[in-house]
């Protein structure tokens, strides 16, 4: 296995099944009647979790052919040389989440996979903290104090592990949330955005958690004033809305939405209710980038992921207004999650 290899431009800039109601869908991205020559797309590099190669892979959106050697600017998987145990290496299946964050002028990445999580130095890929954790981990976020937040869809919890206390720290605090799928730190409101189901009412929700206590003994408390019931079931992704700190991207099995932190309401995203979107974000230009499983597209793409029904070989690009622009296809890939590689919290 290889270390993370990143070009100089990149630094400037989740595989687990979603086991909930992952049925077939007849909605497909609108395609232009005329096939145009692929265009380079400016913006941050894109991180993809690839179950086929069992690697986190970094791609340059300015390169139009992602099967070309210069398209993939970085890749990572755990190795003993990087400081990981044999158990962690064997469990890593390509990732379910990957976020790059800069803290005190040092850049790290937080990542999750089905049954392990880690914080690594970026771009070296060296282990900072890691742990084998059951529960079908779907999302990870590095907190400004060095701790790590995790969401487990089968474990039905949000946890904060005290990674700030050492590379092998196993202390954590837990907030019960059924089918938990996403964690995202908000530096303005100083809270953690999460998606899942209310344990008591079974409602599908987006909500915010305050992190109190100390770095060594954190506490999680829901900020109920920010809770919103999702318009459709099975919340999945929560990501930053580049260019507007008052908004968030939120996806579910039934559609994708924009959450307004002031009004505490959800509205339909410009892409107009695509379903089963596993990862979604926008570039500073406003361009939208997302991934949907090939199994949920009709017709299914000729080049597609045949290994499972929750991944894809295709990354789709849309204008800020929701018009399909084009795609990048990687032969043999099984991408589950896409992340805009912006190291800044927002």
Task: Annotate each predicted stretch with a short phrase.
Residues 72-90, 125-131, 167-175, 219-230, ...:
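A short beta-strand motif characteristic of beta-propeller blades
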Residues 51-53, 61, 112-114, 152-155, ...:
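Short loop/turn segments immediately following the C-termini of beta-strands
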Residues 87-101, 134-143, 177-184, 229-243, ...:
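Repeated scaffold domains used in trafficking and secretory/extracellular systems
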């Amino acid at each position: 296995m290889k270390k993370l290899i990143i070009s100089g431009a990149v630094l400037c800039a989740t595989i687990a099944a979603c086991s909930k109601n992952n049925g077939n869908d007849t909605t497909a991205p609108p395609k232009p009647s005329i096939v145009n020559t692929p265009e380079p797309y400016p913006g941050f590099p894109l991180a993809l979790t690839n179950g086929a190669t069992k690697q986190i892979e970094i791609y340059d959106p300015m390169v139009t052919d992602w099967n070309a050697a210069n398209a993939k600017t970085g890749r990572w998987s755990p190795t003993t040389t990087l400081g990981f145990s044999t158990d962690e290496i064997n469990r890593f299946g390509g990732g379910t989440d990957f976020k790059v964050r800069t803290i005190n002028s040092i850049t790290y990445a937080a990542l999750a996979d089905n049954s392990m999580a880690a914080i690594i130095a970026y771009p070296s890929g060296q282990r900072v903290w890691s742990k084998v954790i059951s529960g079908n981990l779907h999302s990870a976020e590095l907190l400004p104090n060095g701790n790590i937040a995790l969401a487990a869809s089968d474990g039905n919890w949000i946890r904060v592990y005290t990674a700030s206390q050492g590379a092998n720290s196993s202390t954590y605090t837990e907030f019960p949330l059924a089918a938990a799928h996403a964690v995202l730190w908000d530096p303005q409101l100083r809270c953690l955005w999460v998606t899942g189901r209310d344990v008591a009412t079974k409602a599908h929700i987006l909500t915010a958690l305050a992190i109190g206590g100390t770095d060594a003994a954190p506490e999680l408390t829901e900020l109920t004033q920010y809770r919103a019931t999702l318009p459709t079931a099975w919340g999945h992704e929560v990501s930053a809305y580049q260019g507007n700190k008052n908004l968030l991207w939120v996806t579910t099995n039934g559609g994708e939405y924009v959450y307004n932190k002031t009004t505490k309401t959800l509205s339909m995203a410009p892409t107009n209710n695509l379903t089963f979107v596993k990862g979604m974000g926008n570039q500073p230009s406003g361009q939208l980038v997302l991934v949907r499983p090939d199994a949920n597209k009709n017709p299914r793409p000729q080049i597609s992921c045949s290994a499972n029904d929750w991944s894809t070989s295709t990354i789709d690009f849309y204008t800020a207004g929701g018009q399909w622009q084009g795609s990048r296809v990687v032969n043999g890939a099984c991408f589950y999650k896409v992340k805009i590689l912006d190291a800044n919290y927002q």
